[in-house]
Amino acid sequence: MTKHWGGPGLLAPPVITVGEGAQRDHHLDCRIGYSSSKRSCHRSSNPLLELGGRLDKSTGMAQDSCYRAKATNQGPWELQDGNSSGGKKKNYQRYPKPPYSYLAMIAMVIQNSPEKKLTLSEILKEISTLFPFFKGNYKGWRDSVRHNLSSYDCFVKVLKDPGKPQGKGNFWTVEVNRIPLELLKRQNTAVSRQDETIFAQDLAPYIFQGYSQPNKSKPLPPESSLPPVPTRQSPPPSEDPYRPKLDSTFAIDSLLHSLRPASSAGEGLRERESWGVGPPPHTRSTTPPRPCNASYNGSSSASSVSPASDFSDEDWRGVTVVGKRSGDRGITSDAYSDSCPPPNKSSKRGNTPPWELPTSYAKYTPPNAVAPPSMRFNGNPFMPLGGIPFYGYGGAHVTTSHLIGHPYWPILPSGPVSIQAPPLLMDLDSMLQSVPPNKSVFDALGSNNQTVHPSPNQYALQNGPSLCKYSL
């Protein structure tokens, strides 16, 4: 007995041709329908037909799932192509932005106008004509132009109708003196780096046509914050015209001037004689020196007067003014070239007597050792220098005659006096230990009431012939 397998659906699996989706579904439905009809006809005669129908159905579903997975993988590419071909286009085309600031472009179009003023609509039109970036439907740059016109003070609004300050149609002008020069240069952008010959490096020549650029001569902001240094040609008005001019700000004398009182402003001029520099012939004063100094009238201490105070303030000022004029002519470049010693002083430096030692206002360091109260100003404990003239605190009242006489020591009496030679050997250690602060060595040497001086002959033997003029 020969066994018969079902129809072609059982003997061979159904063949599905891969094609378009509609045709594949049509054939699949037809095969499924054909298998169902065969299964219903031969169910009784062949029980294996039911199994063949299930195999046919499962095979078709598997192939259909494979197709759907394949279609899913190909779907996004097909959708992207469809969207790209039928997508919405942009409503404007962007050109590369020019490598200049809005301030530079606005100032350039205003300065190149015939009347040097434009309205807002004219500015927008001129900028869009020069640069294609501002053409098309892109309108965002117009707000940037309005912002720059109202932000920078170099743009000035000229009212079309003064009675309507908020009206439209006003003109805009440029004040070239207020334009920041750093904003006129070409910016470092991708367009400017591609071809540097297309765009000008600086728009200043197109803006300052017929104008001078005053901002170039102005100093930088860090330099403008520094105080101006006084010069010989233009001294500041607050400066004393009679004070000596110093070339170096950090000179020692410039630091000393800040510590000295106003009455001793010309102290450095008076001590120039110690360096042995003679006065120029053209700066010698023709007027005789005044016998007394005006500053001595209000002085009660000998230490407030310089030991070299043999010249009045007025004479020194006159000499200083002459020295200034000669210094401007390029005669000398020394810090003390504006001053000269008085004509009656000798430039030859001899042995310094004790009363010519430096005081608290001199350039030299004064002794600052403080003596005990029992040793102050008694004149006896340290050295018996009775012949040295001394103006003490407990002496007689100073009269007008004391201020006329010795140029080096203006408080001596004007009459003839006898002079005794002081001892040549002096104990400087004991002298320095007993000197009060800000006082000279001479202030602590003599007694309070001794005003007798050595004879001229003995005094000349010690100090040489240069001091013979002290005898009256």
UniProtKB/Swiss-Prot annotation:
Cysteines paired by S-S bonds: none
Location(s), subcellular: Nucleus
Pro residues bias (residue ranges): 219-239
Residue ranges annotated as motif Fast/FoxH1 motif 1 (FM1): 357-361
Main location: nucleus
GO molecular function: DNA-binding transcription factor activity, RNA polymerase II-specific; DNA-binding transcription repressor activity, RNA polymerase II-specific; RNA polymerase II cis-regulatory region sequence-specific DNA binding; RNA polymerase II transcription regulatory region sequence-specific DNA binding; sequence-specific DNA binding; SMAD binding; transcription cis-regulatory region binding
Phenotype reported upon loss of the gene: Fishes exhibit ventral body curvature, reduced spacing of the eyes, and absence or reduction of ventral neuroectoderm, including the floor plate.
Protein name: Forkhead box protein H1
Effect of residue 97 to N: In sur(ty68b); loss of function
Motif window: Fast/FoxH1 motif 2 (FM2): 367-373
Domain writeup: The FM region is required for binding smad2/smad4 complexes. FM2 is more effective than FM1 and only interacts with phosphorylated smad2 that is in an activated smad complex.
Record-linked InterPro entries: Activin_resp_transcr_regulator, FH_FOXH1, Fork_head_dom, TF_fork_head_CS_2, WH-like_DNA-bd_sf, WH_DNA-bd_sf
Composition bias type Low complexity, residue spans: 294-310
Pfam families in UniProt: Forkhead (PF00250)
Region of interest (Disordered), ranges: 36-56, 211-246, 261-360
GO cellular component terms, semicolon-separated: chromatin; nucleus; transcription regulator complex
Motif SMAD interaction motif (SIM), chain ranges: 428-448
DNA-binding feature ranges: 97-193
Species of the source: Danio rerio
GO biological process, alphabetically ordered: anatomical structure morphogenesis; axial mesoderm morphogenesis; axial mesodermal cell fate specification; blood vessel development; brain morphogenesis; cell differentiation; cell migration involved in gastrulation; cellular response to cytokine stimulus
